[in-house]
């Protein structure tokens, strides 16, 4: 049997931030209880949201970072700060083999630029 799928989550991305991302984690877990989550972002904002969803208790690791990519931030600026941001850390988790996939509701341009730099593209793409 293969290991449980691990999903890295940028909890600070999107208009609703951690509330929407943690609710999505809980919903995903209800659909597939083999999933495990690495949630990146401001722990002070994430923990209260996790407390609302007891079903994921023990299935989520929170990795704190106070830095996030703004929706208005240019991809070139975001790349320079990637290592210390929730989005950049989630992508790095995939690169480093800690996660199988990364999810972000944040700045799409920054996500694409950081992902392409960190993960490269598949052959032929």
Q: Where are the regions that the model predicts?
A:
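A short alpha->loop->secondary-structure connector
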Residues: 119-125
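Contiguous, glycine/small-aliphatic-enriched amphipathic segments in soluble metabolic enzymes
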Residues: 1-117
């Amino acid at each position: 049997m293969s290991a449980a799928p691990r999903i890295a989550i940028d909890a600070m991305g999107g208009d609703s931030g951690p509330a929407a991302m943690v609710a999505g984690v809980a919903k995903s877990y209800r659909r597939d209880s083999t999933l495990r989550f690495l949630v990146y972002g401001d722990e002070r904002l994430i923990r209260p949201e996790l407390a609302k969803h007891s079903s994921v208790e023990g299935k989520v690791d929170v990795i704190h970072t106070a830095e996030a990519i703004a929706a208005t931030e240019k991809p070139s600026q975001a790349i320079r700060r990637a290592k210390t941001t929730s989005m950049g850390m989630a992508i790095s988790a995939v690169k480093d083999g800690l996660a199988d996939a990364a999810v972000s509701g944040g700045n799409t341009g920054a996500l694409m630029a950081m992902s392409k730099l960190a993960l490269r593209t598949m052959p032929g793409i």
